[in-house]
Regions:
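Acidic, divalent-metal-coordinating active-site segment for phosphoryl/phosphodiester hydrolysis
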Residues: 205-216
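Conserved beta-strand -> loop -> alpha-helix junction used to position metal-binding or nucleic-acid-contacting
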Residues: 162-176
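Short Asp/Glu-rich motifs
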Residues: 128, 210-211, 266
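Acidic two-metal-ion nuclease catalytic site recognized across multiple nuclease folds
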Residues: 2-53, 214-300
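Catalytic phosphate/metal-binding cores of nucleic-acid and nucleotide-processing enzymes, i.e., regions
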Residues: 179
Length: 300
């Protein structure tokens, strides 16, 4: 995907930031650039409830994306967050925000085009983070492309934990067959398949904008979201090397996340409908995996 293009500030941004309370005089004095803002206290965990009724689509989604200095949170850090609050029934964007987080170095500059020096320029990232938290509280679910990657950065200072349900637009949503998409499409391919022009990539808010435009064009969005929220587990294909194409055609990935295996996250119904046997994979401590009973057409 092509590198980022310069973005002009949106006219709404001053109005949104004007909604953020001004810091008290005590805090206004010489606060370091990387000082963490005061965030709302996390809501207490909800008590256990009886069996839920029929699922419904979330009324609001927080579409989010991150840009980072690497792939591993233990070695890298998040340097940009973009987010859009989206009303599902109305197919409407309610609010949006994007901000950079200061960093000393960015080894992934060749990917996201964000120079470390730019992240350290004066800008109200603390206010942006507070507004992001408010948007998160207003959403019923979070949607991200490759959510497994994005979610691992939240809960690491200064980003808050995310306790809302996650939906992955790459792996959890079963896009209609007539779009002729790969099993795990890229943001670019997903946008183009829905007639959304692509002008930039690898900046957080631009990728969120593409996803919002895709959702606006979905006539059966509620159905797609309800299905995407079904519980999923990781399954490993039980196929010989000669049969590996069957796994590839069914959207399984080789060596990711289980080394030396074809795996994919599926619902129980999806796993049972496969034309080849699969087994559940349970992550264990120390990176070891444990498999359980097989299912699929050939498992009986």
């Amino acid at each position: 995907m092509s590198g980022p293009s310069p973005h002009q500030p949106s006219p709404w941004q001053p109005d949104l930031l004007a909604l953020i309370p001004s810091p008290s005089p005590a805090r206004a004095s010489a606060a370091p650039a990387d000082q963490q803002p005061d965030l709302p206290a996390a809501a207490p965990s909800a008590p256990a409830q009886a069996a839920p009724g029929p699922r419904r689509a979330p009324a609001t989604l927080l579409i989010l994306d991150t840009e980072t200095t690497g792939l591993d949170p233990a070695r890298g850090r998040c340097i940009e967050v973009g987010a859009i609050l989206f009303a599902v029934a109305e197919r409407a964007v309610l609010a949006q925000v994007s901000f950079l987080l200061p960093t000393d170095a960015n080894p992934a500059e060749h990917v996201n085009g964000i120079a470390a020096a730019v992240t350290r320029l004066p800008q109200p990232w603390q206010a942006g983070l507070r507004f992001f938290v408010a948007m998160l509280e207003a959403a019923e679910a979070v949607l991200a492309h490759n959510a497994a990657f994005d979610r691992q950065w939240f809960g690491i200072d200064p980003l808050p934990p995310v306790r809302k349900p996650w939906i992955c637009s790459m792996d959890d949503i079963r896009w209609p067959a007539h779009l002729c998409l790969k099993t795990s499409p890229s943001v670019r391919d997903l946008a183009l398949a829905h007639g959304v022009p692509v002008w930039a990539a690898h900046r957080a808010l631009s990728d969120c904008t593409y996803l919002a435009q895709v959702l606006e064009r979905c006539t059966d969005l509620d159905t797609l979201l309800v299905a995407a929220l079904e519980p999923r587990q990781l399954f490993r294909a039980r196929l010989s090397y000669a049969e590996r194409q069957k796994a590839r055609d069914a959207g399984f990935r080789w060596n990711d996340p289980v080394p030396g295996a074809w795996t994919r996250r599926l619902t129980e119904a999806e796993a049972g409908a496969l034309p080849f046997p699969v087994e559940r994979v349970e992550p264990q401590a120390g990176g070891v995996t444990q498999t359980t009973a097989a299912c699929g057409a050939a498992a009986a």
